[in-house]
Amino acid sequence: MVKNAFISVISQEENRGSVEFQVVSFTNKIRRLTSHLEFHRKDFLSQRGLRKILGKRQRLLSYLSKKDKVRYTELISQLDIRELTTR
């Protein structure tokens, strides 16, 4: 189980409304829910919550990629998540 796995650079930042902080907190929630769902495969409410959080994080990442590509690539590399795929 992953708890309090904030990246040190972003956790020291006091601006909790920033896009980076929100993406980090969503990523931590996603990792916790993923580890929970490995043990409880039939927990459909948690699966729904995971899908909602994934959508929120995807929208924030697309916003950040449009506004500031450098900050987006830094955040993606620090969190070790995949880049957005365009449809």
From Swiss-Prot:
Subunit (UniProt): Part of the 30S ribosomal subunit.
Name of protein: Small ribosomal subunit protein uS15c
SUPFAM superfamilies in UniProt: S15/NS1 RNA-binding domain (SSF47060)
GO molecular function: structural constituent of ribosome
Listed CDD domains: Ribosomal_S15p_S13e
Positions of disulphide bridges: none
Keyword vocabulary terms for this entry: Chloroplast, Plastid, Ribonucleoprotein, Ribosomal protein
Annotated signal sequence range: none
Plastid is among the record's keywords: yes
Annotated family: Belongs to the universal ribosomal protein uS15 family.
GO cellular component terms attached to this protein's record: chloroplast; ribonucleoprotein complex; ribosome
Entry's Gene Ontology BP terms: translation
Subcellular localization, as worded in the UniProt entry: Plastid, Chloroplast
Pfam family, one: Ribosomal_S15
Primary location recorded for the protein, binned into one broad class: plastid
Gene: rps15
